[in-house]
């Protein structure tokens, strides 16, 4: 992290009551209660200036729906940044289906910083002038459309918070998961030893850590190749795995 202050997420939304929501329980909730990170949900409508507290208007050029106004949202962003130090250090994100896909690599970057300001869109979108004028980075969590950016913001914050120092019980946990090395995570097993006639793979109970690591790597490669060929194509060829990398492995669980 770049500052001594706790990692802080500021969310601009028309529905601040949606926060902390699921971030108030489990790992994120305990970390929030203990001060390992901070959350501020700010109502965009508080920056409206007319008596009706209007935040949207019809699209220029016509079309369905409504558009979030640039003047209202810009005022909300500016108010949120007051007293937050240098705004250049703090990412400004807009949750949007047209944004760049959120990756684990980007999550790691965000978790190492001071924490982002996140704008949650609604309606047909927001005025492009505030996106450009306030330097908003558009981020997508998938190729689908939600009713607003709040659920996407919750997902992004959760992904970041679990990587913060002291949040997870075992520091290695965050580095041995799907996407941490570009691969999907290997299959996991625990007791009972035998479940419905299916045993835990013998190698996992062998006590040979090198063989266990090799098995997990091979399973991760097989899963990635079968389920996410887009990720598999980006995995660099490495000497210990060269044979498997030259020929796409087939995972028994994927047929």
UniProtKB/Swiss-Prot annotation:
Biased composition (Basic residues): 244-255
Superkingdom, natural source: Bacteria
Keyword tRNA processing belongs to the record: yes
Binding positions for S-adenosyl-L-methionine per the UniProt entry: 121, 141-146
GO cellular component, one term: cytosol
Localization per record: Cytoplasm
Reactions mediated catalytically: guanosine(37) in tRNA + S-adenosyl-L-methionine = N(1)-methylguanosine(37) in tRNA + S-adenosyl-L-homocysteine + H(+)
Region named Disordered: 236-255
Alphabetized SUPFAM superfamilies for the sequence: alpha/beta knot (SSF75217)
Top-rank EC class of the record's enzyme: transferase
Keyword list, A-Z: Cytoplasm, Methyltransferase, S-adenosyl-L-methionine, Transferase, tRNA processing
EC code: 2.1.1.228
Residue ranges that the Swiss-Prot or TrEMBL entry lists as coiled coil: none
NCBIfam families: PRK00026.1, trmD
Protein family per UniProt: Belongs to the RNA methyltransferase TrmD family.
Stated role: Specifically methylates guanosine-37 in various tRNAs.
Name listed for the protein in its UniProt record: tRNA (guanine-N(1)-)-methyltransferase
Gene name in the database record: trmD
């Amino acid at each position: 992290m770049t500052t001594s202050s706790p990692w802080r997420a500021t969310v601009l939304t028309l529905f601040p009551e949606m926060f902390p929501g699921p971030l108030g329980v489990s790992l994120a909730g305990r970390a929030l209660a203990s001060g390992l990170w901070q959350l501020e949900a700010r109502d965009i409508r508080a920056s409206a200036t007319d008596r009706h507290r209007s935040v949207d208007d019809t699209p220029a050029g016509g079309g369905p729906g409504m558009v979030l106004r640039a003047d209202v949202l810009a005022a909300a962003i500016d108010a949120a940044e007051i007293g937050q130090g240098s705004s250049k250090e703090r990412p400004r994100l807009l949750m949007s289906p047209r944004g760049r896909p959120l990756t684990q690599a980007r999550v790691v970057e965000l978790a190492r910083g001071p924490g982002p300001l996140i704008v949650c869109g609604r309606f047909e979108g927001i005025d492009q002038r505030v996106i450009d004028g306030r330097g908003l980075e558009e981020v997508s969590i998938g190729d689908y459309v939600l009713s607003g950016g709040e659920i996407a913001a919750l997902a992004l914050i959760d992904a970041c918070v679990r990587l913060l120092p002291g949040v997870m019980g075992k520091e290695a946990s965050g580095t041995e998961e799907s996407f941490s090395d570009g691969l999907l995570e290997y299959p996991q097993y625990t007791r009972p030893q035998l479940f419905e006639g299916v045993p835990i793979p013998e190698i996992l109970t062998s006590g040979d850590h090198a063989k266990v690591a090799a098995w997990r790597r091979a399973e991760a490669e097989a899963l990635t190749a079968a389920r996410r060929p887009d990720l598999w194509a980006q995995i660099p060829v490495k000497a210990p795995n060269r044979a498997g990398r030259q020929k796409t492995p087939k995972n028994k669980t994927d047929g």
